[in-house]
Amino acid sequence: MDYISLGKSNLMVSRVGFGAMSLGEIDTDENASALVHKAYDAGVNFFDISHSAQESEKRLGACLYGIRHNVVLATKACVLDARDLEECLDDSLSALRTDYIDLFQYETDEKNIVAFDEIAAQMERLKERGKIRHFGLTTEDFEIAASALDSSVFASIQIPFNILVMKQVESLVKKAQEGDIGFVAMKPLYGGLVRNIPLALGFLYQYENVVPLWGVRNIEELSQILYFNAHPPLVDEQFESEMENIRAFFS
């Protein structure tokens, strides 16, 4: 497993990120634990969840019991007032069975709801109290992500990035790298529409600062991701042709 620094933070994260939003939907606690521990045993150390998925947070907290300090744990919260971040954080800390979050992300798709400087000020207070180590931003909106990068207050941004949303978001990848800001790619399979895992992975691995966040649902999916992470496809003319075929199909 390869590891990269998440921007200018001191967080070294696995190149395979584990998106745990669906963990609460797995049929048993035992199967959820088996999935998380298979990823961990393969070297995955970056686990991402959300305050909005309380059952999944609780499951993840239980699964990481005993190994929590060996992983980079990220969660996020959507608020209308920066002062509400701490309440959401406290909920997540309880659910995740931990006393700190490595990466706490402000989540928004609405422009100008809360000013970034207000978010940053509150996040800094949470850092001073030892509740978080770093803070980032999660959004599905290109303009919000661009503004966040321009503000330089966040350690990372998380936004959908995949074969089908390449051209516009690619500029953000470059800007993040230039600003030494971590870039987490959510929806690498475009919410399941792209079924070719090696193609999706090979595309993202062309960008050395990008950490794909895979929404893992079962052992079979995880096994494929881990296999192609260890054996990435060759980016050649055939690879490019297959990417263009997928884009043409969805255009």
Which positions does each model-derived feature cover?
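Alpha-helix-loop-beta-strand connector modules within alpha/beta enzyme cores
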Residues: 58-76, 121-130
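Short, acidic/polar
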Residues: 27-39, 82-97, 139-149, 196-201
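Beta/alpha (TIM)-barrel catalytic core signal, keyed to glycine-rich beta->alpha loops juxtaposed to Asp/Glu
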Residues: 108-251
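Acidic (Asp/Glu)-rich catalytic clusters
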Residues: 7-10, 41, 60-69, 90-99, ...
